[in-house]
Each structure stands twice: as structure tokens, then as C-alpha cells.
């Protein structure tokens, strides 16, 4: 992506280029071990128009780097390679299957006088390994969610089936990568949980139990409100990648005007006739259509153990969405979908209205939101809970931040420092822009705070962070 900043005098402008994807490929060195068979190793290569010999050369170089680094650390070969112009990231998700992502470093093009070519300055220090390494791991996790493992496809149909699946999935998925907006949240890959009072939570639990009892085919259920998770029957790692798919891909494609609470004219009470705002986000677009298709996307969970293949039914009413997962061997027909719609639609509509009403009451009690003097990111490694006042997710796949990229870079650097040690610790940084950045790591939890108080000293900054912990995280213990 190109950004132009008018820093130069006399009408001359600098051009700033953000990180971008140069290439992405997957190979298995066991598939072409002999000379002259090197092309057989390559299972997928983007961009597709790259000449064959260049593909073979690039894959061969990556093989050599991996083998060379294995001599120093057999269990942990290369994770990344730094060059002036780009950075390469390596990931071996399954034995002998290697994924490589090459990212062009950000750069600034400075114009020269007298008609000389512009001077290019590469800003390789702006790229954080942990962020883009996590993006590469997400690529595999998302593929595995919809296709199962690489080895599963190979066992089912050999190299031909595997390459077909890789091309079909990654051709579309790579277009959704927005490398210029990747940051600390990609490292965490967390889940945003919706805050609820106990009574409303019990209503949701009761609703899930009733539906699972009435629709015995349902194996797992997940309940979300306002793109935040409330209930899940899936394992954490499966839910975290399904959550990412729902919130960055499926839900943004089906945005709708928010419907208000029970006292809204949009939801009149009609005696003896429960209101029904429910609809399928996956599967049939309209149940009344005689030509409706009853095909649902399939997902794979518990791939480390039994590897279950499931139908994914996502059903939504107002701001509430429920995911029903059913064994893929079951044939889902019109009768089942109509039963689900008539059972879930009215109940979910009522429940969504109740949640909205309760949420609005709680907001009125807590008073109007003021613009705080601090912004923060919180992550809990134990339950994957994530909370950020820095990010404003408004578009599919794109994470917009409300702070300067330099501050996001500092957050990433602090996180890298935390990852190097197991002990709890705290880091305080004074940025060049006079902002204070604080990182706290305590008992599997991480908190990052950005303070806009340029005249504050270390003691005052520490007190401010303590106040934040007391107001925002009063039930969480952070070591001082």
C-alpha cells in the first residue's frame, strides 16, 4: 500500500510504502528428492505467474536455510530470515510440510533534485517477527478449520488432491490478508467476551441446553452477541480460529441495522405471536424459496486427536448469533432447517432483545463514557480473553487502531521481551512523542497501557496504571 506524506518543501513529496506480501508458498522436500524433480516439491506458489525456475530456486534457498539452521538447533530450525528489502517467515505445521511467507519491508521513497532517481530507504526494523510469524500460523489454522490437515488430504487423494485444496483455499484467503494493519492482536489471537450479568448468562445457558435437547443432532454450540463470545462448547484452540473466521469474514458480509431493545417500536409485543427475526447466515438464504439449497460449510475440529468433520450452521437474530455444529455424515434437509428455524428463531429474538435491554441498563448505571487519558490491550493466556480500547474493527479483516504506528511498534517490542522470559515483569517506556507505554506480565496475563501524560514522572505513571487496574480489572490480581 502506498501512502504519501507532504514532508518535502517545494511541492516534492515522500512516498511511504507499507508492508506487503511478495510471495507465499508451501512445499514438501520429500516429494521431489532427486535432481530434476525439484518442481514436485512445490504444492502451492503465489503469485502463480512466477516463472518455474525462479520458484524452484526460491524453494531451494528456503530448504538450504532450514537445513543450515538445523545444524545449530535440530528441534527449532529457522523461523525468519532478515534482508534489507524483505523478510521471510518459515513455519512447519506438519512434519516435512513447510509454509513460507515473504513480506516486503516498509520503505520511504525520497525525491532527489536535478531529475535524479528517488532515494529508497527500507525500514526493516519496523517489521516485528512475532506478529508476521503469527499471521503465517493463522494461515495454516484457517486452512485446517475448513479442510483438515495437509496429511489428511494427501492420504485421501495424493498430491493432486492436496494441491487442489491448497489452490482453492489460499487463492481466496491470501486476498484477505492486510499485512499493513497486523499488530499485537495477531500474536494473541484472542477472543473478545461479552460482559453479562449472572441472570442473563443463565438464560443463555438454559437456551443452549433446550435447543441441544430438542435438536439431538447438534454436537457443539457457540453463542455470540455483538461479535463477542458468550458461550462455547468447543475446545479453546478450535473456538479461537472459528471466532476469527466469524468476526473477520462471515459477520461483516452480513451486516444489518441494529434492532433495539424491548421498548423499541421496532419490536412490538403481539399477544400469542412471538416475534421472529431469525435467519440463516450459512445454508439457505430463504426457507420459503422452493429452490433453496441446504448446503452448509464443513469445518474440522479436534484435529490433534479424532479429527471431527462437522456442518457449520450459523443462525442470527438481531445482534445474537448461534453456531450449531452437526456431524458431517448427517444429511441436513429442508425439514430439519424448518424445525430449527421455528424452534430457535422466536427464542433467539426474545433473548437478543433481553441482552440488549440489560446491556443498555448497565451502561446507563455506569454513566456516560468519557474519553480516557489511557488506552489499553489486555490478554489472558489461560482463557484467551482479549480486550482492547485501541482497536476499532470496522471492516472485514482490517483492524483499525486509534494510536500512532510507532506506539504499536513499542507494544510489539515489549511483548517480544515478555516472550523471552517466564517470570512476571513490568516494562515502562517513554516514547519520543512524549507518550508513556507500560507493559505488565503477571500470572499468565498481559496488560499494555498507553498514557497521554507527557509531564508525568515514573511514580505518577505507575499510580495511573494501578488506578486503571482497579477500575477496569478489579477482579484480576496483578502483581506490583
From Swiss-Prot:
It comes from the Eukaryota. The keyword Membrane applies. Keywords: Lysosome, Membrane. GO terms for biological process: vesicle-mediated transport. InterPro entries: Ccz1, CCZ1/INTU/HSP4_longin_1, CCZ1/INTU/HSP4_longin_3, CCZ1/INTU_longin_2. It is found in: Lysosome membrane. PANTHER family: VACUOLAR FUSION PROTEIN CCZ1 HOMOLOG-RELATED. This is Vacuolar fusion protein CCZ1 homolog. The lineage of its organism: Eukaryota, Metazoa, Chordata, Craniata, Vertebrata.
Amino acid at each position: 500500500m502506498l501512502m504519501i506524506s507532504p514532508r518535502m518543501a517545494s511541492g516534492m513529496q515522500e512516498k511511504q510504502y507499507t508492508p506487503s506480501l511478495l510471495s507465499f508458498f508451501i512445499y514438501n522436500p520429500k516429494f521431489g528428492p532427486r535432481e530434476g524433480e525439484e518442481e514436485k516439491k512445490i504444492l502451492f506458489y503465489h503469485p502463480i505467474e512466477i516463472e518455474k525456475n525462479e520458484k524452484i530456486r526460491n524453494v531451494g534457498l528456503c530448504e538450504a536455510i532450514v537445513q543450515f539452521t538445523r545444524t545449530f538447533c535440530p528441534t527449532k530450525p529457522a523461523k525468519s530470515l532478515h534482508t534489507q528489502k524483505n523478510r521471510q517467515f518459515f513455519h512447519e505445521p506438519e512434519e516435512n510440510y513447510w509454509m513460507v511467507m515473504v513480506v516486503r519491508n516498509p520503505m520511504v521513497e525520497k525525491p532527489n533534485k536535478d531529475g535524479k532517481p528517488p532515494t529508497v530507504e527500507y525500514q526493516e526494523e519496523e517489521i516485528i517477527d512475532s506478529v508476521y510469524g503469527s499471521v503465517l500460523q493463522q494461515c495454516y489454522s484457517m486452512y485446517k478449520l475448513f479442510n483438515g490437515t495437509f496429511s489428511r488430504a494427501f492420504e485421501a487423494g495424493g498430491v493432486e488432491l492436496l494441491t487442489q485444496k491448497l489452490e482453492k483455499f489460499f487463492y481466496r484467503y491470501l486476498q484477505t490478508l492486510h499485512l499493513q494493519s497486523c499488530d499485537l492482536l495477531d500474536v494473541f489471537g484472542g477472543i473478545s467476551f461479552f460482559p453479562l450479568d449472572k441472570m442473563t448468562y443463565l438464560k443463555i445457558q438454559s437456551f443452549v441446553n433446550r435447543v441441544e435437547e430438542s435438536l439431538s443432532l447438534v454436537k457443539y454450540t457457540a453463542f455470540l452477541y455483538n461479535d463477542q463470545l458468550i458461550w462455547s462448547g468447543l475446545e479453546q484452540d478450535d473456538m479461537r480460529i472459528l471466532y476469527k473466521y466469524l468476526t473477520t469474514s462471515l459477520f461483516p458480509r452480513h451486516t444489518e441495522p441494529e434492532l433495539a431493545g424491548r421498548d423499541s417500536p421496532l419490536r412490538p409485543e403481539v399477544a400469542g405471536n412471538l416475534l421472529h427475526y431469525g435467519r440463516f447466515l450459512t445454508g439457505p438464504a430463504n426457507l420459503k424459496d422452493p429452490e433453496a439449497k441446504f448446503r452448509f460449510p464443513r469445518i474440522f475440529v479436534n484435529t490433534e486427536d479424532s479429527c471431527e468433520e462437522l456442518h457449520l450452521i450459523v443462525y442470527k437474530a438481531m445482534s445474537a448469533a448461534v453456531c450449531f455444529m452437526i456431524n458431517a455424515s448427517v444429511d441436513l434437509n429442508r425439514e430439519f432447517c424448518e424445525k430449527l428455524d421455528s424452534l430457535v428463531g422466536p427464542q433467539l429474538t426474545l433473548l437478543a432483545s433481553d441482552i440488549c435491554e440489560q446491556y443498555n441498563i448497565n451502561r446507563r448505571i455506569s454513566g456516560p463514557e468519557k474519553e480516557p487519558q489511557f488506552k489499553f490491550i489486555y490478554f489472558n493466556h489461560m482463557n484467551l480473553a482479549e480486550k482492547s480500547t485501541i482497536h476499532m474493527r470496522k471492516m472485514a479483516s482490517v483492524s483499525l487502531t486509534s494510536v500512532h504506528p510507532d506506539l504499536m511498534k513499542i507494544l510489539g517490542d515489549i511483548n517480544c521481551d515478555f516472550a523471552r522470559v517466564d517470570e512476571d515483569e513490568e516494562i515502562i517506556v517513554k516514547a519520543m512523542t512524549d507518550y508513556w507505554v507500560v507493559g505488565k506480565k503477571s500470572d499468565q496475563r498481559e496488560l499494555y497501557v498507553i498514557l497521554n501524560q507527557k509531564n508525568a514522572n515514573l511514580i505518577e505513571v505507575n499510580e495511573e496504571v494501578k488506578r486503571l487496574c482497579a477500575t477496569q480489572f478489579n477482579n484480576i490480581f496483578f502483581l506490583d
